[in-house]
């Protein structure tokens, strides 16, 4: 029987790294905790886990199916488009942060007004279009 290793959170890894006397030992002990998935692999995993079709994701993310297929084929979307995908996936804040990191973008930061509005939307189950309306009404850059 294959035993699944429990993944450590970022703070746990950071603390362990700070206390590590030997980098190689840290790297070897934590190999399973390092992210190696491409954005398209992570998106596919999230789609499957949430039972959402690509057509539905495109519609809920405010993008064309053609553009979505380009993302799944390896095209790197902008940070705003990644956030659109998060809303289309009904992602949790943690899932959104993971997808942003995986795509090479900064996490949402509550001290940034625009990010705070987006975080609120994710935490309160708002859809993309409601969040976009709120961003617009608050004179912040919309997601699309």
Region spans (language model):
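Short, charged recognition helix plus adjacent turn
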Residues: 2-14, 97-125
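A short, Lys/Arg-rich alpha-helix, primarily the initiator
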Residues: 19-53, 131-143
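The alpha-helix within a helix-turn-helix
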Residues: 47, 58, 86
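Key DNA-contact positions within bacterial/archaeal DNA-binding proteins
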Residues: 55, 66, 94
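Recognition helix of helix-turn-helix/homeodomain-like DNA-binding domains
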Residues: 58-77, 102-104
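Short, basic-rich loop-to-helix N-cap that marks the start of a DNA-contacting helix
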Residues: 74-87
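Long, compositionally biased
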Residues: 88-89, 113-142
